[in-house]
């Protein structure tokens, strides 16, 4: 089911895999995501990510904007 999440300015989520394959729609703010292979990208409002790293180290995320990040999370398939 659709979930809305707010992450405050300065928030940091250490390494974690995604709970399931899902789309993340960035509604406001900017965050930086780093993958296990060392790739890092800044993602801003209006972007849509397909998160598929459900196994292993996963990714880490940091809010880099001065305002909170608002995201909508949409599973790509029903949970089992």
Spell out what each predicted region is:
Residues 57-80:
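Double-stranded beta-helix
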Residues 19, 27, 37, 53-55, ...:
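Short loop/turn positions at the edges of beta-strands in beta-sheet-rich folds
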Residues 12-18, 34-35, 41-42, 62-63:
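Short histidine-centered beta-strand/loop micro-motifs
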Residues 1-18, 52-56, 75-79:
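Conserved short histidine dyad/triad with adjacent acidic residue
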Residues 23-27, 46-52, 72-73:
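Active-site scaffold segments
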Residues 6-8, 17-32:
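Short, conserved beta-strand element in jelly-roll/cupin
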Residues 36-54:
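Short acidic-glycine-tyrosine-enriched beta hairpin
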């Amino acid at each position: 089911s659709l979930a809305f999440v707010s992450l405050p300015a300065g928030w940091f989520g250490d390494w974690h895999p995604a709970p399931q394959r899902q789309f993340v729609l960035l509604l406001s703010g900017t965050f930086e995501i780093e993958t296990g292979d060392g790739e890092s990208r800044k993602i801003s409002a209006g972007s849509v990510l397909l998160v598929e790293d459900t196994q292993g180290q996963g990714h880490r995320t940091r809010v880099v904007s001065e305002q909170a990040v608002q995201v909508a999370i949409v599973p790509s398939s029903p949970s089992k």
